[in-house]
Amino acid sequence: MNTEKIKNKLKPIIYPIINFIPRRRLKNKNFTIICDNCWAGKVYQELGLPYQTPFVGMFVFSPDYIKMLKNLKHYLSGNIPLKFVQESKYIKDFDNAYPLAILDDIELHFLHYADEEEATQKWNRRLKRMHWDNLYFKFNDNDACTYELMKEFEELPYKSKVIFSSK
């Protein structure tokens, strides 16, 4: 058996043991992570919590992400339908390997979704789970990020935010 197969078989046994203490100590279980990629989903998985954000299995290019954060209630109100498209303003020769949607004027890349129906259902369901009174924001320096965009993120009026950067 190769190493990867062994790791995959041990994960369901080892992870609950490793995560037991952090999960037990966690008091704040009703929070929403707004992020620019799949990171939020991994956090909820590690903590053994249901997804409380629509930002799972997807990513948003940095310019659109910052634009969205500047008017968050508008974009995440649930009143704007997803419009699926075939072309990206960021990816030349987009191959449509995953669903790509426009939310008003923001591109949402549903990277880990099989089709438009799945993306729409999960997006709408998770929008309803958001905890507007307990938001955390995460940004990183991928996907067309610039130093100026990182500065804009830092200047946003949200208190609980973090940037992961290698720049």
Name the predicted role of every residue range:
Residues 1-29:
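Membrane-proximal basic amphipathic "stem/tether" segments
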